[in-house]
């Protein structure tokens, strides 16, 4: 039976492994265990920044999603950025990812969050279809990045 919960500090090694799998397939990011574990720990220790939700099969983490919080001046309300949605390859296709995503959406609704924004690789058509199936739509906004030293 799959259960959902917020990640704890003891989960960081398993989450880091999932992120390594995710970043190995993304164009813009590279696995860096130290950086990823530092980021995960920062979020877990600071719930005002965000929440990392996990799916567990028995005691093993099989999927994760990261929700980061801010305020939209356009809406005048709290909003979230959804990142790092990843399901272990051996567990894909069984509905775990869809269930975790629905759980994340409900988590946001329960906290009064009014919008969830996410980014996915431009060439990752299957991920885009996955998000569209639960109601996400393409935005006219174009993401841009400036990496600082």
Put a short name on every predicted segment.
Residues 52-54, 60-69, 81, 86:
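Conserved beta-strand in the GNAT
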Residues 60, 71-82, 92, 139:
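A conserved beta-turn-beta hairpin within the catalytic core of GNAT-like acetyltransferases
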Residues 101, 108-119:
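Conserved GNAT acetyl-CoA-binding A-motif
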Residues 118-127, 145, 149:
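Conserved beta-strand-loop-alpha-helix junction that forms the acyl-donor binding cleft
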């Amino acid at each position: 039976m799959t259960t959902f919960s917020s990640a704890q500090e003891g989960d960081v090694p398993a989450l880091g492994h999932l992120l390594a799998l995710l970043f190995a397939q993304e164009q813009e990011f590279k696995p860096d265990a130290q950086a990823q574990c530092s980021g995960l720990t920062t979020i877990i220790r600071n719930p005002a920044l965000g929440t990392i939700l996990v799916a567990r099969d028995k005691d093993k983490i099989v999927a994760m999603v990261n929700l980061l919080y801010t305020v939209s001046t356009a809406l005048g309300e709290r909003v979230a950025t959804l990142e790092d949605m990843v399901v272990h390859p051996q567990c894909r296709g069984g509905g775990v990812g869809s269930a975790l995503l629905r759980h994340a959406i409900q988590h946001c609704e329960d906290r009064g969050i009014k919008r969830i924004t996410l980014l996915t690789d431009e060439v990752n058509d299957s991920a885009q279809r996955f998000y569209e199936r639960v109601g996400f739509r393409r935005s006219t906004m174009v993401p841009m990045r400036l990496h600082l030293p």
